[in-house]
């Protein structure tokens, strides 16, 4: 972050409930520390997509931040299942889902897009990149209008992995 979060940011972030889905203990700790520094009110954790789906159904997070590669249910499959969840089940299938991955090739980005990921962030992840992605996700949700089952308006945009420090490698 170029600047410290404003009082308004901190006030808003205190209202957020964010679910981290990551099999690496170190990465979960890092993401938790980053989110705490932003003032996020409630941080939930899951080690894989299977546990995340249980937490999603029971706890109703506002945002999901997930890794792509996990077992037994990876971030792609978890995203597909979240998007398929009906509002009749009390779930929000349009929840912002941010995927963090070290795999930034076009095939991975397209796969994430096809499964309904809101934004794709490249590792290593900077605090400013995560902060900007969260603000963008809650300010004006970006989903894919060509994704079957999406119920809300959204601008079309090309999904590109966000690179820390302006790195443009793919």
Task: Walk through the language-model features, giving the residues of each.
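C-terminal output helix
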Residues: 107, 125-134, 138, 142, ...
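Active-site beta3 strand of CheY-like receiver
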Residues: 59-65
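Receiver (REC) domain active-site loop signature in two-component systems and cognate sites
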Residues: 70
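Two-component/phosphorelay signaling modules centered on CheY-like receiver
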Residues: 25-44
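Short, glycine/charged-rich "phosphate-handling" switch motifs in NTP-dependent
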Residues: 118
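Helix N-cap/capping motif at the beta->alpha junctions
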Residues: 45-54, 75
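CheY-like receiver
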Residues: 11, 139-170
């Amino acid at each position: 972050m170029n600047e410290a979060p404003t009082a308004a940011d901190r006030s808003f972030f205190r209202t957020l409930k964010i679910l981290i889905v990551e099999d690496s203990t170190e990465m979960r700790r890092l993401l938790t520390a980053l989110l705490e520094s932003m003032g996020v009110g409630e941080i939930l954790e899951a080690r894989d997509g299977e546990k995340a789906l249980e937490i999603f159904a029971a706890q109703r997070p506002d945002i999901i931040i997930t890794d792509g590669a996990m077992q037994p249910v990876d971030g792609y499959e978890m995203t597909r299942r979240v998007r398929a969840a009906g509002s009749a089940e009390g779930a929000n299938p349009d929840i912002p889902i941010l995927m963090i991955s070290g795999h930034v090739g076009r095939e991975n980005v397209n796969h994430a897009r096809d499964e309904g990921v809101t934004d794709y962030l490249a590792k290593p992840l900077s605090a400013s990149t995560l902060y900007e992605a969260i603000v963008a996700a809650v300010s004006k949700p970006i989903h894919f209008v060509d994704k079957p089952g999406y119920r809300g308006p959204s601008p079309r945009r090309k999904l590109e992995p966000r690179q820390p420090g302006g790195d443009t490698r793919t």
